[in-house]
Structures are given as structure tokens and as C-alpha cells.
């Protein structure tokens, strides 16, 4: 049973933030999209903009989501690799080394596609993972487990039983780099780009050894995959081969945090499909409802119906909708606009009367189509519910949010404090 009289529905539109785009009337995808349901909600609530981590940081989703859920990622021992391993169900023990991976396309010493065309099927991924997991040379190098998650994405865990491993290593991925305790998206990265080498980030023997193992592992994986029958077939039909494994965001520890219930007394649940959000939910001690990665109107509708049902039992229902992020990465303005419209028509249309509940809608980061990656642009924020006065916003867009009464919120972790204050001030 929930504790709050007025539950909170917290909806994150992955990567929805964008920039005015020439050729589309200098509009953003949110501005160009038809979103009558979101706009109706915006007219009833209050808006603003938020830097999900902080100004100047282009966060990955893990840092953005942790922050939105009240945890300052710059103070955590945060690893996307560990979070995804936990979310995908791989056994992870202290001392193991976990990494987030992509099947990618390498050619002539360069990465030409970080996602192997973004069309690796579940069957193809399963065959490629099996080839890696059963290779004797790789097994002779180190004990490990590679698991396919969704599409080109994988989680990888090196077992630390036989030797010490270090997370103080650079990413073997040209698009992301470590900055302090978090990973940020690099700006201005263009492909093809040279295959990066993993290097130690300190002078310890264990960091040097771990970096050396990763470089050996990457080279051996490439030799295993380049002539695999899956890739022979992909090349024959004109697709990019999935012949390289990008590895990033190493970690050896699970983030040590108070649960959401310990912090706020909230009983929470996450509705999600991606391993990173599911892993975060497990780390902060909230329940999960797992959906297949269905971006159709029906898929969004099912999530809306489930969110409403869960609000009868939980204080906080967190819903993560991936749709807008991928077309942003692909520079596909029309695709991102359609994803937003589908979410409005499928998900938000099912919510009905939320006058006795609190609604928060925002994003974990911006993924502008012109940038084709994450940026540090602030994202729009909408909060509505009992006692929240309308500020006159007519639409849920970046431009209206900049004029909203919440103003500029400097850190995403401030949002949960606002929601707690609102939810506990209404009898």
C-alpha cells in the first residue's frame, strides 16, 4: 500500500530536449510535434528548465536518471557498466569489472559505426555473444560473461576471482570519456574515428594490467567476429558488420546509496525496458515492471494503462520512455517528432484525470538532432497536481519551459525535493 494520499507519476522522455533546427522552421521536434495531451497537461501545471546533472555536463542516461531520482551522480561511485550488468541479470560481485558494450563496425583500424547500423537482430546478437563466450582464446585470457541486452547493446563482466581488476581505465569507445566520477558524451565526435586504446587512468600496476587485458580482449573479439557467419550474411545484404565490441564505463562497485524509501518514505516502482533504468531501480530499492522495447502506439498505451494501475499501490511510479533518444542520435528530426507524437497519442492519452495526483514530465538529457549525441542543454520540466497553479504555459516545449515559473533548476536532484514538498503539503 502507498503512503501518500496523492501519488506521483514521474515520466522521463529519454533525450527529448533539442535545439531549433534550420529547415524545420527553426523549431525543435517538441515544437513541431502535435502533442494535444501533453499541451493540455502543461496548461494545467507549471514549467521550467533543468540541468539534469549540472551546467556544462552532457550526461549519459545513468547519471541523468540517478540525478532525477534525487541522487547526485558526482558524489557516487557510478558505473554504467555495473548498473547495466545488474539490470540485465548478470551476477556481479565486488571485485568484478563490469562494462557497457556496443556491437560496432570497425574497418581499417577505425570505428565507422558505433551501433553496427542499429539493426542487429536478437538472433544475430545471441549468435555473436555465443561465439565470444565460447571462444577458447578469450577464455584463456580472463574469466568473463558477455550478455546481449537490446539490439546492439551488451553488458560484460570480467570476473575478479583470479586477479585484481581496476575501474581506473579509459573507455574503449570514441564517443564517451570519464570526467571525475561520471562519464560524459564527447562533443564534435565524427566517424570514422580511430579505434581508441584503453589506457590506465592512474599509475597503479592493476590499472595498467586491466587496460592491457581490455585491449587484448577487444582485438581477440574482433578476430572472432569479423568472419562470423552472421557478419558474412550482413555484408551480403548490405548491412554493416557487427565485428567490434566497444567497451565503456568500467566499474567494480555497486553504488552505495540510501533507498528511495529510506530517503523519502516513498514506495516506488519503475516501468521500463532498458537495462540501465532497471539496474538503477534495483540499486535504489524500488520495484520494476519490465516491458518489451515496443515503441508502437499500442506499446505506449500499455505502459499508460499500467502506470495508472500502479498508482493505486505506489507512492512513486517512474516511467522511462526511450522513443525520442534514438532518432536524436541518428539526426532524424522527423523520426524524433514522430516518436514524441506517438508517446503523446499512446501514453499520455491514457492518463485521463490526474487532478488528484502529481505529474512530473522531463528528460534525462538532451539529444539534439543537429548534434547527434547528448549535450549539456537543459531539458523542459512540467509539474502538475493538487495545489500547483498554472503559469500560463500553453505547450510542453523548450521555449515555453524557459519562460515557466520554475525558472532554471540547476541540478536534476532538486526535482524530487520539490515533489516531496508538494506531495506532503497537501492533506
Each language-model region and where it sits:
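Feature captures the catalytic ectodomains and active-site-proximal regions of enzymes
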Residues: 1-427
